[in-house]
Amino acid sequence: MFLIRKFEERDVPDCAMCFYESFFDCPLTENDKAFLRDYAQVLAEKCSFTYVAESEGQVVGFIIGHYKKDFDKALAKLHDVKPHYKAWFRCFFKFAFGGYKMSAPFKAQFDVFYKKLKENGKDTPLACDCELMALCSRRDYRKGLGTALWNAFRKRCEESGVKTVRVFTDTDATYTFYEKRGFKFVWEKPYSFGMLGKSLVYEIKLNRG
């Protein structure tokens, strides 16, 4: 059983490790961990809402959603947690100018992750009411965790009047998770940076009573 609740600032270190274990497998230095903490904080604060899953007092997963302006401008401007804009700028400039001094193995893996992320461009069909921005978990807690987080995400969307949710993912990620929960394939595009694989967009339409 997992306790699902709203994200709090104290959850940043645990969320950073969830993010790491979802996408990377190389050893980490303290500099790598510092970057992951800043990245997780910015990701959670820039979006509309984040839910975390707790197991025995430890955060072992999180899900993030962002309302689109075309759906509701007021909702799109709101954040469940207070944004720390100085932290955002610090993260951006340290990353851009190599200030984190990341280890070579982690930097190599993150560079590939970032290239995939940048495939989300102007031609990506993400017009929807709410975008599912991230779903991450610790490796040892995945059975039932994604479903529990998705159920909380879906309930939040339905209560907000959301009719459509879309997610940008890729063939290297667990896109089958979304298919099993009713998401339908919308779009695909081969990677543009020479690596085998495709970017994907999935959509689900929510039924509101």
What function would you assign to each model-found segment?
Residues L28-T50, S55, I64:
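Active-site rim helix/loop that mediates acceptor-substrate recognition in acyltransferases
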Residues V52, Q58-Y67, K118, E131-C136:
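Conserved beta-strand in the GNAT
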Residues C128-D129, C157-D170:
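Conserved GNAT acetyl-CoA-binding A-motif
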Residues F2-M17, Y67:
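A short beta-loop-alpha structural element at the N-terminal edge
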Residues D70-C130, A134, F193-L196:
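Conserved acyl-donor/pantetheine-binding loop and adjacent beta-alpha core of acyl/acetyltransferases
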Residues R142-K155, K180:
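Conserved acetyl-CoA-binding loop-helix of GNAT-fold acetyltransferases
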Residues K115-K118, T147, E159, T171-E188:
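Conserved active-site alpha-helix within GNAT-family acetyltransferase domains
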Residues M133-R138, R166-T176, Y191-M195:
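Conserved beta-strand-loop-alpha-helix junction that forms the acyl-donor binding cleft
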